[in-house]
């Protein structure tokens, strides 16, 4: 098994969303998180930069459902160079219009973390 090259942290919002998922979906989430932790170069089918933001998104596909998790590289502006990643919030993608609200939610969560820190 590969050694971890990235450490991941979860917000309470992410953990709450994850807790509500079925086992099959949780397994897919865990798989993508393992890739993020162990692969220096992560394929864009798993992580993409969100243009015009400071965030990336993790992509989790389960059947026809497309889940997204907004993530933040704590110690670098580049995801590939990052050693610490924060999973901010997750959602079931319904449309691209939804991203504006989810990005705002991610900013609020990140703001809370930078002001007081409640990493897990």
Language-model segments: which ranges?
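Basic, Lys/Arg-enriched alpha-helical interface segments
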Residues: 1-66, 77-84, 92-120
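Conserved catalytic cores of phosphodiester-cleaving nucleases, focusing on short active-site segments
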Residues: 88
């Amino acid at each position: 098994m590969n050694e971890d090259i990235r450490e991941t942290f979860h917000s309470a919002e992410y953990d709450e969303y994850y807790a509500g998922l079925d086992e099959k979906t949780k397994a897919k989430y865990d798989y993508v998180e393992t890739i993020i932790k162990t692969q220096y170069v992560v394929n864009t089918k798993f992580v993409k930069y969100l243009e015009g933001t400071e965030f990336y998104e993790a992509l989790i596909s389960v059947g026809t459902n497309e889940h997204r998790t907004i993530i933040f590289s704590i110690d670098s502006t580049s995801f590939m160079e990052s050693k610490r990643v924060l999973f901010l919030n997750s959602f079931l993608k319904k449309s691209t219009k939804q991203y504006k609200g989810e990005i705002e939610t991610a900013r609020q969560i990140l703001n809370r973390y930078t002001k007081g820190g409640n990493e897990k």
